[in-house]
């Protein structure tokens, strides 16, 4: 993951973003002296009216310091982007990708194939959360939901 300059990347992590966040944080920390980094959450800004002007403006900015030549934008939850936004990003990857690199975090594989073909895709390690169960675990809810609900209703009347 120590590649520099950073290629366009897709960080695919099904139903989570913990490993992607760790990877992004480590890369930013290791390269903040030679890259400008920015993040945007596509879950909050995903329409063509909001997202496209913001990305176009970001690509037109100059780096923060004279010795910095590469700028990297992390698009969190890119699977929420509309088809029009993805089309705009695809065109941007074709035309202006020398100094402005895009990283995508996706939880569902719904990016356009034209974007995926221009990026290095990485499947992030799964985050496993093993719950710590204390006390008795009643599995009746899964094995016989009707009886469980009936038992809960009966206990409310008592």
Model feature map: region roles:
Residues 1-158:
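P-loop/Walker A NTP-binding region and its immediately flanking N-terminal helices
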């Amino acid at each position: 993951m120590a590649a520099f300059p950073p290629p366009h990347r897709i960080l695919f992590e099904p139903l989570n973003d913990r490993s992607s966040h760790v990877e992004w944080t480590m890369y930013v920390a290791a390269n903040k002296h030679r890259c400008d980094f920015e993040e945007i959450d596509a879950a909050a800004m995903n329409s063509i009216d909001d997202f496209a002007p913001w990305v176009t403006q970001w690509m037109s900015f100059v780096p923060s310091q004279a010795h910095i030549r590469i700028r990297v934008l992390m698009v969190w939850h890119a699977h929420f982007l509309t088809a029009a936004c993805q089309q705009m990003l695809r065109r941007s990857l074709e035309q202006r990708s020398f100094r402005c690199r895009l990283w995508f975090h996706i939880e569902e594989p719904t990016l356009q194939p034209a974007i995926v073909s221009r990026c290095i895709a990485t499947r992030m390690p799964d985050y496993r959360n093993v719950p710590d169960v204390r006390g008795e675990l009643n599995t009746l809810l899964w094995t016989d939901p009707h009886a469980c609900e009936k038992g809960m209703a009966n206990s409310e009347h008592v």
